[in-house]
Structure formats: structure tokens, C-alpha cells
């Protein structure tokens, strides 16, 4: 049984790992481009490096999650993946512009195969580290780690590259990921009894079947992914809005406002969670709420009001993401929990990329129509979540506030 206060210390140790590896993950996207330009003079090669780091993670998410659900010694597996990711960044930092481009891209791709364990895979461990009654707050704080990394990671990479060297900047981020991986070894994850069974082809589809058949998981997964198609388009929309307001800084400033709002929303939700009995409903409500301030952006006469609208929308995405994480943990069975997390994260990334690409194709529609389309996408996603929640298991899957009683806090 967990001692009073022990869960708090375990959560703190987990958050140290999460911040280190996610700072590295977010910062690497900027550092890779800067490194490529410095060493080769080609921003295109930088884009190829970023793609090599990100795309394999989408493909590797199902097998990585399934393997994590089967492996017996979880600490070694998760620590090894994080260390390999960080080591890959360090190798790229030394080899870019000096070794053949194909070799450097292959190393980045190999590191990218580990990214599902930095995001959803790492989050899936919280259910084994934190007492059931504290998991709602724990997932909110984990959402904060994503927000902080998304804001601070690129800034840290830029600052390190400007003050030292682009290669050293990427190597430092890689070292942070390696340190995070080593700290995983201090987390009390017990070896699985009966673990180590060989991975079968049927195991790879276990989470996909759950996301299609289980009403709560189906609802929160596909609703959040559909909403992400809209928010994925926002970087393109913000560039067009900056031109509309004749304010160049608004291209990044509006996205920063949304990120800061999301951070604030996550902190408030961690302090006072709501809707914890049915997180899938919280996801749908927050999707709808996200679209309301975005729909008001066209009426904003100046960039200041648009900035406020984006910040308010961000305040809604913080609780949305925390409820999504809590819902995955609550409804995913033990045998497929990590795979549900990694596959869900992969779907969100895919939908976001699709939204960004579609916005780029449709940019001639103008910022007003595009931002209204993003707002409508959130409303449609909320409606989709409500429809997908219908099913024979929807009512029976509601669980008490304390969460599943069958899972011990220390795994």
C-alpha cells in the first residue's frame, strides 16, 4: 500500500522525466532545422530531418505500444527507448553536414521510432505510479508538462543555438533525453508477472479494435482527433491573420497566446478537476467550448482582441487534453493500455498534419473563412464524440471517482 505522501513524490519524479524528454522532443524540431542550415545551408535538409524524426513515430506507435504492453521489465524497456532517442539526437548533432545525408536521416529515423514512448507511452505509466484518487490531478499535471515543453522547448533550442552552437544545442537536448531515460530507472515499476510473451500479429490490432468498438474510448479518441484537424490548421491561419491585422508578430504571437492559455487551463484543471466521472463527456464539452472564442475572432477589430480569443480557446484545450489522458487510462484494459495511449497520440498527430496540409491548400479562402472552419471543426468533433458514445457499453463503463479498484498504485 502506498504511504501517505509517497504518491506525491512519485509524481514529482515522473514529471522530472516527462519534462526532460519532452523538452528534448519539442526543441529538436527547431534545433534540427538550425543545424541543417548552419552545416549545409539547406533548410530543405532541415525539413527532411524533422520529417525523419516525426514520421516514423506515427508508424511505430502500434508496435511500440503493443511491445510495451508485453515486455516484462518495463523500466528497462522505457528507459532504453528514451536513452536511444537522446543518443540519436547526439549522433545527428555530430554527423549532420559531415556524414552522408542518407546516414544522418537514417539515424534520425531510428530515433523517431522511439517517440511514441516519449509521449503517450510515458503517460501510460502514470496509472501504475499514482494512487487512483490522485490520477485526475496527475494527468492534468502531465498535460502541463506537454504545454511547458511546447513553449519552452523551441525557445531553449533557439537560445542555445544562438549563444553556443547549433550542434551543441541539439546535443544538449539529446543529453536531456538520455538523463530522463536514466531517471526512469528510479521509478518503482514492478516487473509484470507473466510478461515477456512473444508479440503476435493479433496484438498489434488490439488497441485499434478497442478504439472502434468501446463507446467511451471510441468517443474521446475520434472526437479529439477530429478536433485536432482544426487546431492543426491554426499555424497557417495565424500567418494569414497576421497579414490581415498588418502585425507580423501575430503569426507566432497568436499561437503563443493559445499555448499560454492551454497551460493556464491545465493548471486550473489540476487544482480543481471537474467531470472526472465521465472524462469522455468532458472532452466533448471542451471541444465545443474551444470553438466558441475561435468563432469570435473574425469579429475582433484588432489583434489584441484576437489574442484574447486565442488565449480563451487555449484555456479550454488544457482541460480537454487532461480529460483525454484520464479517459484513456480509465477505459483502456491493462493488456492494451500503452498501445491505446500511443495509437491515440498517433491519430491526433496524423489528423493535425492533415489539417495543416488542407489549410495550406485552401489558404486562398482567406483567414476569416478558415478560422470559422476551425471553429466549426471543434463543434463537429464534439457532436461526433456524442454520437460515438452511444452503445451498449456506454452506461456500464462509468466508474467511481476513485477509478478502477483492480489496479494497484505501484503497478
Stretch-by-stretch model annotation:
Residues 58-95:
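Conserved MFS/SLC helix-loop-helix module at the cytosolic interface between two early adjacent transmembrane helices
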Residues 33-39, 152-173, 240-244, 353-374:
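Transmembrane alpha-helix termini and helix-breaking/packing motifs in multi-pass membrane transporters
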Amino acid at each position: 500500500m502506498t504511504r501517505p505522501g509517497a504518491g506525491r513524490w512519485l509524481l514529482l519524479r515522473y514529471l522530472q522525466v516527462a519534462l526532460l524528454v519532452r523538452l528534448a522532443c519539442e526543441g529538436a524540431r527547431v534545433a534540427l532545422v538550425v543545424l541543417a542550415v548552419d552545416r549545409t545551408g539547406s533548410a530543405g535538409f532541415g525539413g527532411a530531418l524533422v520529417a525523419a524524426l516525426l514520421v516514423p513515430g506515427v508508424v511505430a506507435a502500434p508496435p511500440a505500444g503493443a511491445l510495451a504492453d508485453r515486455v516484462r521489465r518495463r523500466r528497462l524497456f522505457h528507459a532504453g527507448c528514451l536513452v536511444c532517442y537522446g543518443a540519436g539526437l547526439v549522433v545527428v548533432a555530430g554527423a549532420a553536414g559531415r556524414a552522408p545525408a542518407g546516414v544522418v536521416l537514417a539515424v534520425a529515423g531510428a530515433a523517431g521510432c522511439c517517440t511514441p514512448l516519449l509521449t503517450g507511452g510515458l503517460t501510460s505509466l502514470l496509472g501504475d505510479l499514482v494512487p487512483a484518487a490522485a490520477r485526475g490531478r496527475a494527468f492534468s499535471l502531465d498535460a502541463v508538462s506537454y504545454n511547458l515543453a511546447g513553449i519552452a522547448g523551441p525557445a531553449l533550442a533557439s537560445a542555445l543555438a544562438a549563444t553556443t552552437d547549433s550542434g551543441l544545442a541539439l546535443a544538449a537536448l539529446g543529453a536531456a533525453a538520455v538523463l530522463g531515460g536514466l531517471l526512469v530507472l528510479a521509478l518503482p515499476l514492478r516487473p509484470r508477472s507473466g510478461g515477456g510473451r512473444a508479440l503476435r500479429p493479433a496484438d498489434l490490432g488490439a488497441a485499434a479494435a478497442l478504439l472502434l468498438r468501446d463507446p467511451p474510448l471510441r468517443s474521446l479518441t475520434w472526437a479529439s482527433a477530429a478536433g485536432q484537424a482544426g487546431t492543426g490548421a491554426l499555424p497557417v491561419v495565424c500567418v494569414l491573420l497576421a497579414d490581415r491585422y498588418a502585425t507580423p508578430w501575430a503569426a507566432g504571437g497568436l499561437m503563443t497566446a493559445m499555448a499560454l492559455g492551454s497551460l493556464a487551463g491545465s493548471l486550473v484543471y489540476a487544482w480543481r478537476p471537474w467531470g472526472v466521472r465521465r472524462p469522455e463527456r468532458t472532452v466533448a464539452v471542451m471541444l465545443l467550448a474551444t470553438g466558441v472564442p475561435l468563432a469570435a475572432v473574425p469579429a475582433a477589430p484588432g489583434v489584441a482582441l484576437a489574442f484574447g480569443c486565442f488565449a480563451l480557446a487555449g484555456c479550454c484545450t488544457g482541460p480537454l487534453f487532461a480529460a483525454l489522458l484520464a479517459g484513456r487510462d480509465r477505459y483502456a484494459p491493462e493488456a492494451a493500455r500503452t498501445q491505446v495511449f500511443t495509437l491515440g497520440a498517433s491519430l491526433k498527430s496524423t489528423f493535425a498534419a492533415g489539417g495543416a496540409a488542407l489549410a495550406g491548400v485552401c489558404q486562398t479562402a482567406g483567414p476569416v473563412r478558415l478560422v470559422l472552419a476551425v471553429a466549426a471543426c471543434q463543434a463537429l468533433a464534439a457532436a461526433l464524440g456524442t454520437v460515438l458514445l452511444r452503445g451498449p457499453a456506454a452506461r456500464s463503463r462509468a466508474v467511481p471517482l476513485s477509478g478502477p479498484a483492480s489496479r494497484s498504485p505501484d503497478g
